[in-house]
């Protein structure tokens, strides 16, 4: 860069940063999410932001179009050394030049690699949660980011994994969103075996089933007419297309949908996989009910497929009622062979994911959530006179030891300006101590919301503040 050139210090497109009030909201929601995850016994882990590219590409090509590749930017002397190291393929750091690296685009594929690396150190079924950042090289637009925080849970087993783990997922989703208090939401549940089995029974060939499922999964985005067109482009006949449309539009209560599915199997050929999917769906639904999730929170939706190739059984999508345009706010499902890519053995798993950065952005824009105060401080001890600073420090520390968040104002300025500063930061209470109050071991406690001001003995100050905060 030439001397005098201006540096563009704006953030790259799609890489968000947060003001204090926004970051505090994210941390508040993270606390709720972690608390619910841990109440079900999920344990935290962290995986690297960077993985070998071959790891991220290990299960199909679902991530190829969104993977961010990276490579170190070496100074000229290091680059020359690396260029000279062509015979060994390594530079002085020991890095192999041919090893392509990339930023993780989700948490599930890195989890599979993590389990493969630590197989003998983990206890199975292994239930973990992560709240890391992920990175996607897709076009940035409103509500979609290239870097965002994703909150995931997964349970993985060595051989068999009970379907009751699948049933826990809607219960966990329900507890989180009820605690956040975002309004009415609906968890839509399906099973990929139901879709795959039905497609087989109406004569869709094996090589076309995945692409047809992906088309059906886009029903809400592109509409029924476009789905029909796309299916016909895949070589699906008009009669088959209509059967598929009629199938994914089956609705009613959970029990009504299950009854309709069972009745359907009586009139179709090759229904073994379809029947297995229905049986799994029944088991999961029974578990969801036993966990206390009410039916206004979940339904069976046969159009839900989840586009990622690795899902093989139960799948979930959650929508906010009245705000369906926001899209899915939590999704996931069961996979059977994802971890086996690295180990060569069947290791079934089930999990869900909340794209927290996207969710916060959407809910703030829709007015469903509001940011928090710019500071966690609940009290400001104002600066009336410099010679009383030792008293202000002692009072501040006494309040902190009582569990109250406190800012001590070290700058001397007019009292009204100090009140304005506290109010601007969202601080509700100011503690005022002048020479007379200090001599009498008293303070004035001012509520900036109501304007009320009361006299309180210093020995009772923490108790009074806590009473008013509650």
Swiss-Prot record:
GO terms for molecular function: ATP binding; histidine-tRNA ligase activity. The keyword 4Fe-4S does not apply. Keywords: Aminoacyl-tRNA synthetase, ATP-binding, Cytoplasm, Ligase, Nucleotide-binding, Protein biosynthesis. It catalyses: tRNA(His) + L-histidine + ATP = L-histidyl-tRNA(His) + AMP + diphosphate + H(+). Residues 69-99 are annotated as: Disordered. GO terms for cellular component: cytoplasm. Gene3D superfamilies: Anticodon-binding domain, Bira Bifunctional Protein, Domain 2. GO terms for biological process: histidyl-tRNA aminoacylation. The keyword Aminoacyl-tRNA synthetase applies. Disulfide bonds: none annotated. Residues 79-94 have a biased composition (Basic and acidic residues). Transmembrane segments: none annotated. Its EC number is 6.1.1.21. It holds the Pfam family tRNA-synt_His. It is found in: Cytoplasm. It comes from the Bacteria. NCBIfam families: hisS (TIGR00442). Belongs to the class-II aminoacyl-tRNA synthetase family. Homodimer. This is Histidine--tRNA ligase. It comes from Nostoc punctiforme (strain ATCC 29133 / PCC 73102). The lineage of its organism: Bacteria, Bacillati, Cyanobacteriota, Cyanophyceae, Nostocales. The gene is hisS.
């Amino acid at each position: 860069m030439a001397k005098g050139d201006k540096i563009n210090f704006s953030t790259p497109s799609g890489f968000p940063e947060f003001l204090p009030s926004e970051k505090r909201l994210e941390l508040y929601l993270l606390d709720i999410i972690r608390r619910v995850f841990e109440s079900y016994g999920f344990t935290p882990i962290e995986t690297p932001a960077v993985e070998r590219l071959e790891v991220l590409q290990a299960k199909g090509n679902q991530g190829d179009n969104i993977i961010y590749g990276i490579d170190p930017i070496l100074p000229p002397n290091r680059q020359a050394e690396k260029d000279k190291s062509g015979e060994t393929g390594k530079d002085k750091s020991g890095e192999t030049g041919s090893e392509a690296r990339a930023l993780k685009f989700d948490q599930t594929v890195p989890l599979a690699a993590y389990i493969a690396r630590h197989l003998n150190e983990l206890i199975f079924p292994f239930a973990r949660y992560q709240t890391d950042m992920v990175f996607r090289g897709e076009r940035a637009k409103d509500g979609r980011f290239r870097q965002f925080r994703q909150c995931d849970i997964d349970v993985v087993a060595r051989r068999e994994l009970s379907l009751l783990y699948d049933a826990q997922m809607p219960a966990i989703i329900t507890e989180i969103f009820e605690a956040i208090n975002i309004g009415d939401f609906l968890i839509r549940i399906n099973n990929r075996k139901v879709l795959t089995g039905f497609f087989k029974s109406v004569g869709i060939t094996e090589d076309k089933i995945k692409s047809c499922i992906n088309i059906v999964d886009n029903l809400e985005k592109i509409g029924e007419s476009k789905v029909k067109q796309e299916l016909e482009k895949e070589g699906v006949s008009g009669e088959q297309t209509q059967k598929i449309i009629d199938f994914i539009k089956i609705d009613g209560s959970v029990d009504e949908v299950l009854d309709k599915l069972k009745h359907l199997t009586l009139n179709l050929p090759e229904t073994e996989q379809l029947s297995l999917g229905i049986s799994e769906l029944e088991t999961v639904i029974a578990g969801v009910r036993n966990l206390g999730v009410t039916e206004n929170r979940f339904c069976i939706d046969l159009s839900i497929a989840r586009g990622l190739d690795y899902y093989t059984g139960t799948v979930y999508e959650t929508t906010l009622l009245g705000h369906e345009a926001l899209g899915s706010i939590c999704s996931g499902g069961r996979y059977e062979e994802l971890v086996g890519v690295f180990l060569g053995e069947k290791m079934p798993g089930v999990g869900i994911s909340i794209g927290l950065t996207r969710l916060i952005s959407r809910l703030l824009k829709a007015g469903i959530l509001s940011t928090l105060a710019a500071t966690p401080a609940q009290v400001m001890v104002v600066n009336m006179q410099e010679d009383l600073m030792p008293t202000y420090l002692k009072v501040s520390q006494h309040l902190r030891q009582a569990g109250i968040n406190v800012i001590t104002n070290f700058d001397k300025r007019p009292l009204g300006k100090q009140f304005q500063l506290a109010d601007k930061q969202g601080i509700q209470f100011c503690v005022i101590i002048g020479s007379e109050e200090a001599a009498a071991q008293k303070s004035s406690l001012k509520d900036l919301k109501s304007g009320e001001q009361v006299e309180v003995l210093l020995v009772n100050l923490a108790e009074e503040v806590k009473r008013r905060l509650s």
